[in-house]
Regions:
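Short alpha-helical segments that sit at the start of domains
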Residues: 1-19, 78, 82
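Short beta-strand "wing" residues that participate in macromolecule-binding interfaces
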Residues: 62
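Short capping segments at the starts of secondary-structure elements
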Residues: 19-27
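Short, cationic-aromatic polyanion-contact patches
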Residues: 10, 65-85
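Alpha-helical DNA-recognition elements
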Residues: 53
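Amphipathic alpha-helical dimerization/coiled-coil segments
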Residues: 82-130
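Glycine-centered, phosphate/nucleic-acid-interacting loop/turn motifs that mediate DNA/RNA or nucleotide
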Residues: 58
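Short acidic, hydrophobic short linear motifs in intrinsically disordered regions
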Residues: 26-35
Length: 133
């Protein structure tokens, strides 16, 4: 059952969503193997329980088996939607709603190469133009 008030995926749920966003549908065994390759060697029952919780939250959908008895899972939420909500929450809670402070904080913890800086400059130029219109 989903925890009340739990709008964002937990760390493990986010890892599973990333696996499903990369390639879906996936079975429990396939998800467990992908988690193990990423350094999370979990019991089969732990993965099943987590998938049930995620289905209850509406993050994933359990599909009926095609062949055999293995259920398959697909994401019900898009990566862009999850990242937008999580970033918005972070900006609100940590940076008091200031996007500028969040970007400054990002620059302090992440080194950017020239290509990333150029792309960010293009984005800022576009946003500046939109704000003036």
């Amino acid at each position: 059952m989903a925890r009340p008030g739990s709008h964002f995926p937990t760390e493990l749920e986010l890892e599973i969503l990333k696996i499903l966003w990369a390639s879906a549908p996936r079975t429990v065994s396939e998800i467990r193997e992908a988690l193990a390759l990423a350094g999370r060697d979990l019991a089969h029952t732990t993965v099943i329980t987590t998938l049930g919780t995620m289905a209850g939250k509406g993050q994933i959908e359990k599909l009926e088996p095609e062949v055999g008895k293995a259920f398959r899972f697909v994401p019900r939420v898009a990566h862009a939607e999850v990242s937008r909500h999580m970033l918005g929450d972070l900006v609100h809670r940590v940076f008091a709603g200031s996007a500028e402070a969040a970007v400054q904080g990002l620059f302090e913890v992440k080194d950017l190469d020239a290509t990333e800086i150029a792309r960010l400059r293009q984005l800022l130029n576009r946003k500046t133009k939109e704000a003036r219109e």
